[in-house]
């Protein structure tokens, strides 16, 4: 038996299936070193920011910002300044129903984070956007 979710392209296949089966996905993303350079590295986050904006136009997903930053006002100010899409910060969207109202974790279809396989998540999401824009299933 093979570990399906560590096979090549499994992330994209699952993302694609969820999008076409449910017509809407939930994109969660971190702030530091994902959409905003952090102190330690001199890097750009422009490609990820642009992809999130394109996702909003093409996929119409829900967006959750999932961050360790406790200054939510500062986070909101940054998101608005950068015109980054978000529906919730560190919370599930309202359609998520918990068994016994136990909120165990934030639910998402895909997570973009510099410490959690950002390159693979970026590529899978970009591939889905390209596919949906072209109206051809890859």
Regions found by a protein language model. Name each.
Residues 1-138:
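HAD-like aspartate-dependent phosphatase fold
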